[in-house]
Structure formats: structure tokens, C-alpha cells
Amino acid sequence: MKTSIFKSLYVQVLTAIAIGILLGHFYPELGAQMKPFGDAFVKLIKMVIAPVIFCTVVTGIAGMESMKAVGRTGAVALLYFEVVSTIALIIGLIIVNVVQPGAGMNVDPSTLDAKAVAVYAEQAKDQGVVAFLLDVIPGSVIGAFASGNILQVLLFAVLFGFALHRLGSKGQLIFNVIESFSQVIFGIINMIMRLAPIGAFGAMAFTIGKYGVGTLVQLGQLIICFYITCILFVVVVLGSIARATGFSIFKFIRYIREELLIVLGTSSSESALPRMLDKMEKLGCRKSVVGLVIPTGYSFNLDGTSIYLTMAAVFIAQATNSHMDIFHQITLLVVLLLSSKGAAGVTGSGFIVLAATISAVGHLPVAGLALILGIDRFMSEARALTNLVGNGVATVVVAKWVKELDAKQMDDVLNNRVPANKSHELSS
């Protein structure tokens, strides 16, 4: 039990889920009583939603002040991020509606503990577009954080980030404080994620005990559907963008294969960030472009997370028979265009933003998160891998658009004519 294998969170969660399935199947009544473990984990995740989004967005925007190529490069990068992440959201929405992996589960939302999401209970109501947009503006900043309204926190974070950016060197102290606070928050998240096996065990034992083994088949359909969607997105969407930019997506994937293995092992695209900065520069992208696009992309260009968010949200609606008409789905898309920008490339961040998004939409049962808690860890690999490839492609595209890409060097490196570690570098 003390071997390195059992120290892996991935193995721990896998083991916990297996135990939860067995307990729920053979002792359904006892399995159903394990529900509080899953609820407790969800509450712990909710506890850090507001601060993690605030810190991530503020440091992401204000952090641009230390980079030279902010102007045109920043505008092009943000435009690219918005367009491609929107495409990812739409693709996820379309496929989950076509495949309908949650249809037939017939989960009664009333059996899901609403107390676990009491902070957002008052938002569970329909409202018009005008009322929805006005609700984004908080009555007070403290109130936004106290109520856990993610859109209000996000709006304040964006304004705060831009204001801090305009202060320049005068705001460096504040930036450093927020960045340090952000590290503390992510430290808390890491501690919470260590409890993921317990939460996954409780959620899976309850789900199987309450709804039977057939539920696992439905959850398996969601996992398979999500992985296939991510593969199609990388090959078709990112592949087409890469081809239009002048390189092969398959050769690019081969080039960053070591970074992909790191991400696969950690389920976090952030774990490969330092290596990606170096790799993209050696590929032929100017250092100033790499320094701006890669870090910013970890908050604003998470394609895999975008696909996950739409698919998971609609899956919960299908599983709980919560009707979502075209207005509700458009509202979900609009909310995700905002809230998905607050997801950092770390393990568990997708689940955090999903919880925030569902609560902000106000139409889906937030307690329904317990349905996918047990499998979220297994979807994180596809999220992280897609995010990493997406940010790499974005860097090359932006570099070419702003004419800061050495196309010959990129071609030589991708075709193994010049070793990446010996290719010449472009200085900023």
C-alpha cells in the first residue's frame, strides 16, 4: 500500500470508484448512505470558486504589463482565443444534444441534496435576457463574493485587472500580493483534490446504490462521447487551423509528445507550461509572443475545458430530465463564454468552473454535479491534453499573424531537419 502506484491520485480515485461501484451494487442501501462524502467534497470545491476565478483573471490580465508585445499581439491573441473557444463550446453543445448520453437516467433532482449547493439556491429561477445581464452587475463587491455569484465576481475581476494594468509599476505590489494569494488558493485546491477519492467513492456508491449499475453505463457513454469529441476537435478544427497556418497538426503533436506525456500523467496542462514556453520559442515563435500567448491562454484558451463544460452541463440536464429549450442553451453558451475564461489549467479547475456555471445559469440542479463527480477525474486527461495542444497551436497562429514567426525554422524543426535544441532563437 506504500508503493508509488498507490500514491498516485489517479489510482486512488480509480480504486475509490471501483469500491463505490461494488458497495452500491451489492449493498445499495449502505451505498446510498455514502452520499454525504460526495456532498462534502462538492461544498469544499464551491468554497474556493470565487477566489480562484478572481485571482486567475486578475493576474492573467494585469500580468500583461511586464510584456513588451501587448498591443497588437494581445488583441490578436484574445480574438483568436474567443473565436476558437466559442467553436469548442458550440461543438460540445451540438454533439451532446445529438448523442444524448444522459437520456434515460431519469434522476430525480429532489433526491440530490440541495443543501450542498445552498449558496446558489436563490439563483435557480428563470429570468429574461435583460434581467440576466443586469444581475451580472453586483450590488456590492463584498456581496458578490459572499453570495458566490461567479459572473459578478468575474466582472469585478476583469475591471480590477484592467485598472491594475493601467497603474503600471505603481500596481506591482498589489499584483504581487494577488499572485501570492493565488498560489495559496491553488495550494488549498491541491489539498482539497487529495480528498477526491473520498468524494468520488461517496458519489459513486450513492449513484449506483440509488440508481443501479445501469447508471455506470450512462456515465461511460459520457466519457466515451467526450474523448471522441476532443479527438475530433484536435484533428478537424485545430488540424484545419494548423494547415491554414502552414504546418501539420500531427507533426506538431509529435514535436510536443514529451509535454503531452507530462500532462497525461498529471491531468494538468499547467504542469507542462515551462517546457512549452521553451519549446514554442525553439519552434520559431518570437519570445515576446510566446511569453504573452502561452500564459494568457491558460486562462482564456482552454478548448478541452470548453467542450467539457457544455457537454457536462447538458448531460446533467438530460440525466435529471431538466428541460433545456433553445433559450436556456443559448443562455448556457453565453455564461460559458464568460465563466470558462476563469478556468486555470490545473487539475479540478474544470469541475470548479462547471459548478460555478450551473449555479449562474439558474436552471439546472447544481446538486446534479454529484452525478459526474466520480468520473470527472477520468475526463480531466482529455481536457488537459486538448488544452495543451490548443495553446500550442494558438501561439504559432498568433505569431504568424503578427509576423513574428520564422516559418523556415518551424518547418525544419517539425520535419526533423534541425534538432529543436539546436535551432536558433528569435530574441524579442
UniProtKB/Swiss-Prot annotation:
Positions of transmembrane segments: 8-28, 44-64, 76-96, 142-162, 184-204, 222-242, 289-309, 326-346, 352-372
Subcellular location: Cell inner membrane
Example GO BP: L-aspartate transmembrane transport
Molecular function (Gene Ontology), one example: fumarate transmembrane transporter activity
Membrane topology label: Multi-pass membrane protein
Keyword check for Cell inner membrane: yes
Keyword flag Transmembrane helix: yes
Alphabetical keyword list: Cell inner membrane, Cell membrane, Membrane, Symport, Transmembrane, Transmembrane helix, Transport
Disulfide bond entries: none
Superkingdom per UniProt: Bacteria
Alphabetical list of PROSITE patterns matching this protein: NA_DICARBOXYL_SYMP_1, NA_DICARBOXYL_SYMP_2
Single GO cellular component term: plasma membrane
Alphabetical list of NCBIfam families matching this protein: PRK01663.1, PRK13027.1
The protein's role, per its UniProt record: Responsible for the transport of dicarboxylates such as succinate, fumarate, and malate from the periplasm across the membrane.
PANTHER family: AEROBIC C4-DICARBOXYLATE TRANSPORT PROTEIN, PROTON/GLUTAMATE-ASPARTATE SYMPORTER
Family: Belongs to the dicarboxylate/amino acid:cation symporter (DAACS) (TC 2.A.23) family.
Identification of the protein by name: C4-dicarboxylate transport protein
The organism of origin for this protein: Klebsiella pneumoniae (strain 342)
